[in-house]
Amino acid sequence: MRQNRRASMIVNRILITLIVLVSLSFLFLRAGPKFSEADRACIQDEWQENKSLNVSSEINNETYQIVFADVQKEFKWIFLPKEISGNPDILMIVSSNRDNFARRNVIRKSWMNSDKNKIVAEKRMKILFLVGVNSENEKENTVVLKEAEVFGDIIVVDLEDNYQNLPYKSLTILLYGQSKTAESVKLIGKIDEDVIFYPDQLTPLINDGTINMSISAIYGEKWNAGVEVSNKDETNKWFIPKYSFKCQLLPSYLSGPFYLTTRKAAERILKSTKHRKFISVEDVFITGLLAGDVGVEKKQLPSMYMYDETTTDTAKAEILAWHNFKNNAEFLESWENLRLSRCKACRKSRNFRGSRSQLDEERNQ
């Protein structure tokens, strides 16, 4: 028995050490090489005036345009949810893949559920999904449109879902938040569907001024200026060709799986797109280059884990958002269990309910 306990303690220590080492390595990477005035000047030189181009905006109630210096595209709002009721301060939009119905249901049962999240129950936060469809695949599109009609929580646009189109999709999120919602919405959140998120953790951050919804700012996990550009290996997911961006180092930016943009910042970013050539690396492009061009402040939030390895289910630190690679059952179980132990604002919430029996019920549905 003692040997088992001792072995368990050793394993736990090893795990803690590994987490610390991984965290330190990410901090080192976030710092990057020294970012000089020459690097800053290079980024500024890449900016283009382009007075003849329109800004990214709605064309009419059915179509909108995303405009870059070298490419301009029009898209259609295929399905829009009914007008948002109440006066929410926050709009969270989940960037969701068309065929991922099961994951959308997991999110509806967890952090989107008004029975388990006070900020949602009080209608201070509205949550929607954004799904892109290929107009040529009518059969799959019919399924998505039926889901949108039944649940009323999906924005559908004619945008093919792939990595290259992520900047268009994320800018669509900002455009919807800026043009399709009441003025009460002051914060527009972009979140990927593989992020465990605790909405009630935002309340104390807003109350203590960590998040200021009245300024032009973007909040998330911040990477400092100086990360090297990947411009040599075309097979690299984060490859940026030199004809799109010639500089060697990147400005500061926020991790793409989760970030919060104030309405003022969203309006500025949308106006700035026409001054830059298209880059497919969404977080660098939108939260780094475009946000930087128009003076949007980039701010670090606490309790952010945007890499799966930076925390575990057995760690103790608070969680606001955790980007991970769990399957649907694991995602739901972790969300429920960590709500009990690593979400202080959840434990204080009057809407908090015993989740273990509830989890069993949901598994059997």
From Swiss-Prot:
ATP-binding as UniProt keyword: no
Highest taxon of source: Eukaryota
Glycosylation sites noted in the Swiss-Prot or TrEMBL record: N50, N54, N61, N212
One cellular component (GO) term of this entry: Golgi membrane
Topology of the protein relative to the lipid bilayer: Single-pass type II membrane protein
Regions that span the bilayer: 9-29
Side Lumenal, residues: 30-365
UniProt pathway: Protein modification; protein glycosylation
Enzyme Commission number(s) of this protein: 2.4.1.-
Positions in the Cytoplasmic compartment: 1-8
Enzyme class (EC, first level): transferase
Localization of this protein: Golgi apparatus membrane
A Gene Ontology BP annotation from the UniProt entry: protein O-linked glycosylation
Keywords, in A-Z order: Glycoprotein, Glycosyltransferase, Golgi apparatus, Insecticide resistance, Membrane, Signal-anchor, Transferase, Transmembrane, Transmembrane helix
GO molecular function: glycosyltransferase activity; hexosyltransferase activity
General function of this protein: Transfers N-acetylgalactosamine onto carbohydrate substrates. Involved in susceptibility to pore-forming crystal toxins in conjunction with bre-1, bre-3, bre-4, and bre-5. Involved in resistance to the nematotoxic C.cinerea galectin Cgl2.
Family: Belongs to the glycosyltransferase 31 family.
Protein name as catalogued: Beta-1,3-galactosyltransferase bre-2
Species lineage: Eukaryota, Metazoa, Ecdysozoa, Nematoda, Chromadorea
Name of the coding gene: bre-2.1
